[in-house]
Structure formats: C-alpha cells, structure tokens
Amino acid sequence: MAQNGRFSLGVRVLALLAADAEAMQTSTTLAEALGTSPVMVRRIFGALHAAGFIQQRKGPAGGAKLKKPAKEIGLGDVYAAVGSDWPQVDEKTIDTVLKRVHQDSLKAMNETTIANVAKKLKKT
C-alpha cells in the first residue's frame, strides 16, 4: 500500500477507535466499516501500536483501542508512525531544505488531531 494509503487508513482507524475509546474493536469490524481487508487493518495496528497510540489484546475478546487520548494524536504523528517516505537527496543544500520542509509539514499536520477528525466524521 502506498504511503498516502497507509496514512489515510491509519487516520481512519484511529478516528473509529476514538468514536468509542473504551471499547476493543477487532480488525474485522474496522475493516468492514472502512471497506478494506482485516489484514491491512492489522498491519496498521502494528504501526500504531509501535507508536504508542493503541493497545492491543489477542484472543477471542481481543482487538485494539486507543492508548493515548485522541486529542493528543496529531496527523503528523500518524504520518510518521505509518512509515513516512520523504525524498532524500545527496546534495547537502537541497537535503537541508527538504528536511526543514518535512519538519514544517509535520508540525502543520499536527495542528489537526484525531479528535478533530473523529468529530468531523461524526457530523457527516
């Protein structure tokens, strides 16, 4: 899955988890709601868990739920967690500029949180 697909899926998974922050949600339930494969959701779970955004439980009563409050998870954090592919070049001057642009982009993305996204989705 392309970077923007992983990012989009990560945001949507977190927004659904935020809608009922105390409940464990299975990858199958989330996949059905999002129109994707449970395998893709589980892959995203792995990245989100590694970033400390969700907690997981295996077994019949398993699933995932938010570990960190939705208002503390910025979109830039999600982008970084799911494996951001940012261009790198050998030219030091250009690479320095690209790194600054990347940092500024993540900072701007973090102005919107998963709580903001979940709230907007609830209205629709």
Features from the language model and the residues they span:
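Alpha-helical residues within the helix-turn-helix
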Residues: 32, 49-50
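A short alpha-helical element within helix-turn-helix/winged-helix DNA-binding domains
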Residues: 25-35
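Conserved segment of winged-helix/HTH DNA-binding domains
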Residues: 70-96
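Beta-hairpin "wing" of winged helix-turn-helix
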Residues: 51-67
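Short helix-capping/hinge SLiMs at alpha-helix to coil transitions
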Residues: 18-22, 68-69
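C-terminal regulatory/oligomerization modules of transcriptional regulators
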Residues: 90-124
